[in-house]
């Protein structure tokens, strides 16, 4: 049991660090560590992320034997590694993404028109009001950068989700669980995963979720989850997915959203990148136990040698 406690302690430390991971190297290291944690729990893991979904391009694990598939966020350059990526990205262009793109286009069009008017004014005046033109140009470039950043973020989330779906389909396996990091995935992608793999459980680790809380979402039998949560988290608020919550979370039926951090006890400074949160260690330890029991209940009692399995 000492080895299992050490593994849980490592997973606890990892979960505390994940919210502060910013650089690609740090995120990649976090993915490797998370893979080791699941391997220590006895699961065969496939890590999908920065190198695509085929063979040696995988960050870790063999997809033909994986029981847990971990998906991390992609960007536009990495999305090109996905087979039929354009078709997948076109399918993922739901109404929400279309509305976002339309809003960005309208903003850019208005700013371009304002810039043209200011240019005409500056050209007709002898003294000129070039500071207005410079200001408009700066706002235009800022809006353009934000639009490109938003489009890349949407495409990255969609690409990661559909790469996960494509990987599971290609190898014709029945994964025990899907694990998502950060904001990976879209409502449409989760719906397709649920339709194609209804037997799989969902573990959703969200560092900056609704109200900036650290959340874990589990999919399983509602009665069993309610009983387990009533025993392990008597003081926590367990919210049904029927509530008006984030669309990504609501899209997975029969799930439970567990907030392991009280929003009133945490601090978050945005958009400076500084993120500090006070985490209840006992709650995260209990969350690890519940995740282990739901994904592989038989190993909950007789998991005696995690070091050799890792």
What are these regions (language model features)?
Residues 75-79, 184-187, 209-211, 262-265:
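Short acidic, S/G/P-rich loop/turn micro-motifs used as interaction or catalytic elements
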Residues 66-69, 201-203:
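Structural motif
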Residues 71-163:
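Active-site metal-coordination/substrate-binding segment of hydrolases
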Residues 35, 201-202, 208-310:
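Active-site-adjacent substrate-binding region
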């Amino acid at each position: 049991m000492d080895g299992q406690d050490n593994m849980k302690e490592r997973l606890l430390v990892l979960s505390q660090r994940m919210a502060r991971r910013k650089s690609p190297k740090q995120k990649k290291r976090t993915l490797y560590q998370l893979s080791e944690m699941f391997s220590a729990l006895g699961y065969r893991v496939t890590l999908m992320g920065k190198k695509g979904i085929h063979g040696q391009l995988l960050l870790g694990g063999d997809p033909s034997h994986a029981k847990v598939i971990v998906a991390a966020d992609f960007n536009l350059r990495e999305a090109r590694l996905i087979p039929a990526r354009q078709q997948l990205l076109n399918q993922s262009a739901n109404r929400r993404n279309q509305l976002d793109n339309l809003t960005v286009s309208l903003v850019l069009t208005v700013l371009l028109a304002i810039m043209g008017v200011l240019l005409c004014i500056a050209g007709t005046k002898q003294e000129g009001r070039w500071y207005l033109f410079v200001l408009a140009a700066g706002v235009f470039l800022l809006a353009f950068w934000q639009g490109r950043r938003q489009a890349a973020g949407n495409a990255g989330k969609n690409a990661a989700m559909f790469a996960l779906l494509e990987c599971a389909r290609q190898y014709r396996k029945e994964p025990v669980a899907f694990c998502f990091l950060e904001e990976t995935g879209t409502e449409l992608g989760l719906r397709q995963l649920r339709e194609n793999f209804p037997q799989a459980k969902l573990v959703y680790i969200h560092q900056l979720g609704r109200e900036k809380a650290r959340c874990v979402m589990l999919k399983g039998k509602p009665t069993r989850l309610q009983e387990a949560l009533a025993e392990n988290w008597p003081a926590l608020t367990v919210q049904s997915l029927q509530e008006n919550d984030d669309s990504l979370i609501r899209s997975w039926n029969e799930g439970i959203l567990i907030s392991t951090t009280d929003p009133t006890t945490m601090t978050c400074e945005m958009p400076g990148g500084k993120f500090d949160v006070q985490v209840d260690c006992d709650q995260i330890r209990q969350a690890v136990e519940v995740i282990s029991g739901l994904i592989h209940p038989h190993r909950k009692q007789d998991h005696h040698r995690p070091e050799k399995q890792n």
